[in-house]
Amino acid sequence: METIKYLIIDTETTGLDASKHEMLAFGAVVVVDGRIVETLELKIKPARIENADKKALEVNGYTERAWRDAVTKRDAAEILKYFLITHRDATSVGHNLQFDIKFIKAFSAEQNVELRVPWPYIDTRDLCRAVLAPFGLQSMSLDSICEFLGWKRKNAHTALSDCEDCAKLIINLCPPSPRFLLRLKAMQLLRNMGSLL
């Protein structure tokens, strides 16, 4: 039987525009045959923090103190290069993955280091839209999806924690296990009964 390998990635950034904002953190979880086998979390020292969107820093929990042990951009580029090459045989997974890929490409160009996110890609937003929306999920934010599934989020909006939540999604939804689908059906019935009362 062929091994199924996923590389779940997430970035935290100083804003939404990859041409002027920076990657503050990179997280990854490697899943092989439904089991988490490796994780990576890098905090990266920003060079242009004055260009940061204050709201983005607030969401990501950025403070100088929290990032005091962060790696330099150069070191981060070398670590990422090795990590992505090591896992080039995986299918890349992320929540709004194109956003993360844009920042990784900008970081790659800035550091003059080739960083290739393995292809093919699976976006968990699209996966949840296909599998969970029929059961009543309306918002495709990771917070809303986890709440819908009754999953408590720890350290939301940190790169590694978001990857861990996406790993749970990919393990349960790709393909959906019969047990998980039965649980969704039960949740849908309970919601429907609640709206009748």
Regions found by a protein language model. Give the residues of each.
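A structural motif
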Residues: F135-I145
